[in-house]
């Protein structure tokens, strides 16, 4: 199934926040990404409907197996590319921003 870059970004953000904070709610995603509550709410609904996340009665977000697989793949790419760009002399902030853009478009072969 083809998944959009924005969905990959949401899944990656949920993964990173869960590693940092334990429990993750939509408001945490709003604060991390700087998007509106409405746009995050719509995205979370789509991710839930497509079987990528679950939302419990308290609003906590959990990555389901398909969502976790995508999030871990994207996050791994992000870390690899950030490190690579920093090795080229790019500052950490710029390296992370550029990695976020590149992580979605490079092939598996390129990243091996």
Language-model-detected regions and their locations in the chain:
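N-terminal helix-turn-helix DNA-binding core of bacterial DNA-binding proteins
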Residues: 2-35
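Basic amphipathic alpha-helical segments that dock to polyanions
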Residues: 10, 29, 40-50
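Helix-turn-helix DNA-binding elements, focusing on the entry/boundary residues of the two helices
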Residues: 26, 44, 81
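Residues within the alpha-helical elements of helix-turn-helix
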Residues: 32, 70, 87
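The short coil/loop that forms the "turn" connecting the two helices of the helix-turn-helix
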Residues: 34-35, 58, 90
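Basic, amphipathic "hinge/linker" alpha-helix immediately C-terminal to the N-terminal HTH DNA-binding motif
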Residues: 59-77
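Amphipathic alpha-helical dimerization/coiled-coil segments
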Residues: 79-112
